[in-house]
């Protein structure tokens, strides 16, 4: 069955959510890769101020996901999706006219918090509508997600030839259209409408006492830290191998990652599901993720086999990283729902995203420090060996998850959360 037929096989809310995510990522990524340059250039902010703005934007999203998830479970998925799109429209619109640091900070915080509102709600809504097709639904969702990431920067690059503020205005327009589209096309769906009324603190207590869920979040934090190296360690390695043509090599790595995500996602998911099943696929995917860094660990530079071979090792690592990331995402999203016991799904998604986001931030600081130390000592192998070790720990955590859940599966084989 082709991708188009699979897409048409989902109900209207699921299809709307997938298209919505495509639009969200186009609107976001047509702007964000170029924001720091605008802040430091035409707007004239100091480097510390640029870092502050980017940090506020990141924290207001990553740090607030659990708030968005909690609100979605209380007020329904659709209102939070619409509110998030509307707030991001306003945040980008403010960025068009912002000329001072306080106004830029407000705009950055608004755009970040908007993502914290709609992100858990979108995933909770899709999980509810997909029913038993969660893995397939999230695989298709990731195709739209990655397509937006690929196209967004290209659209932004074209608009930058005119003016950065036109790019920002266009991004605001995209989210404005998404707001209207969700109002018209997305049916109302109240999350956990039949559950007993509890306080927010009681809901949070349910989540933080869910040991299998926390084990998943901790293990996947390691996996996300490894996946993020397509933006950190691998580009830095490219600049070392090809200092005069590093951008060409980096573009090649991103092209490979994008092609795998968009063109291979459904095939990878189907093959993993048939070969290993939902639970074991997480372990296998994390194992491939850890193994992704073996090529660059064996050939960290051009001294042993030449620069060409080292470049091929780098591209191979990027390719394996892309395959592993594509393999993990659908099963990971299903696991969050399964471990929630279909209760407080958006709240679980929100906490999950916050835990992973904060963990990746800390992990990147550690990895960056390790890379600096390795460069001073001229021992690149330390970096790649450290990343492989992180992957091994993540695999061990996911295997431990099997131990947690082996005695608590319901009749459909989905993991059950503790009551």
UniProtKB/Swiss-Prot annotation:
Keyword annotations: Cell membrane, Membrane, Transmembrane, Transmembrane helix, Transport
Main subcellular location of this protein, as a coarse class: membrane
SUPFAM superfamilies named in the record: MFS general substrate transporter
CDD domains: MFS_MdtH_MDR_like
Pfam family, one: MFS_1
Transmembrane residue ranges: 15-35, 36-56, 77-99, 104-126, 140-160, 166-186, 213-233, 246-266, 282-302, 309-329, 351-371, 377-397
Keyword Nucleotide-binding included in the entry's annotation: no
One MF annotation (Gene Ontology) recorded for this entry: transmembrane transporter activity
Example of a GO cellular component annotation carried by this entry: plasma membrane
Membrane topology recorded in Swiss-Prot or TrEMBL: Multi-pass membrane protein
Family per record: Belongs to the major facilitator superfamily.
Name by which UniProt lists this protein: Putative uncharacterized MFS-type transporter MT0872
Organism name: Mycobacterium tuberculosis (strain CDC 1551 / Oshkosh)
């Amino acid at each position: 069955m082709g991708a188009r037929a699979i897409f048409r096989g989902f109900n209207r809310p699921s299809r709307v959510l997938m298209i919505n995510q495509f639009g969200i990522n186009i609107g976001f990524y047509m702007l964000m890769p170029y924001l720091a340059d605008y802040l430091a250039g035409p707007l004239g902010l100091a480097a510390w101020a640029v870092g502050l703005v980017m940090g506020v934007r990141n924290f207001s999203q990553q740090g607030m996901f659990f708030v968005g998830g909690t609100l979605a479970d209380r007020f329904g998925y659709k209102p939070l999706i619409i509110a998030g799109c509307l707030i991001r429209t306003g945040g980008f619109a403010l960025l068009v006219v912002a000329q001072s640091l306080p106004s830029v900070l407000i705009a950055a915080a608004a755009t970040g918090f908007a993502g914290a509102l709609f992100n858990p709600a979108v995933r909770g809504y899709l999980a509810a509508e997909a029913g038993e097709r969660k893995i397939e639904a999230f695989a298709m969702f990731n195709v739209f997600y990655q397509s937006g990431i690929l196209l967004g920067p290209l659209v932004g690059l074209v608009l930058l030839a005119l003016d950065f503020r036109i790019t920002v205005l266009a991004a605001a327009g995209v989210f404005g259209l998404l707001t209207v589209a969700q109002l018209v096309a997305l049916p109302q769906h109240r999350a956990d409408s039949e559950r007993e009324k509890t306080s927010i603190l009681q809901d949070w207590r349910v989540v933080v006492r869910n040991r299998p869920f926390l084990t998943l979040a901790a293990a996947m934090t390691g996996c996300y830290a490894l996946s993020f190296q397509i933006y950190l360690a691998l580009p830095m390695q490219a600049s070392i191998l090809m200092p005069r043509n590093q951008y060409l090599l980096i573009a090649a790595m991103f092209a490979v990652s994008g092609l795998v995500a968009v063109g291979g996602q459904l095939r990878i998911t189907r093959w993993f599901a048939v070969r290993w099943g939902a639970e074991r696929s997480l372990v296998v995917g994390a194992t491939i993720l850890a193994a992704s860094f073996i090529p660059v660990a064996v050939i960290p530079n051009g001294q042993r086999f030449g620069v060409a071979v080292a470049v091929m090792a780098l591209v191979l690592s990027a390719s394996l990283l892309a395959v592993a990331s594509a393999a993990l995402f659908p099963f990971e999203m299903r696991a969050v729902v399964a471990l929630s016991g279909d209760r407080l799904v958006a709240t679980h998604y929100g906490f999950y995203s916050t835990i992973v986001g904060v963990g990746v931030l800390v992990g990147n600081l550690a990895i960056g420090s390790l890379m600096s130390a390795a460069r001073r000592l001229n021992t690149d192998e330390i970096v790649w060996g450290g990343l492989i070790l992180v992957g091994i720990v993540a695999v061990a955590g996911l295997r431990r998850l099997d131990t947690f859940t082996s005695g608590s599966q319901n009749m459909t084989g989905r993991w059950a959360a503790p009551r």
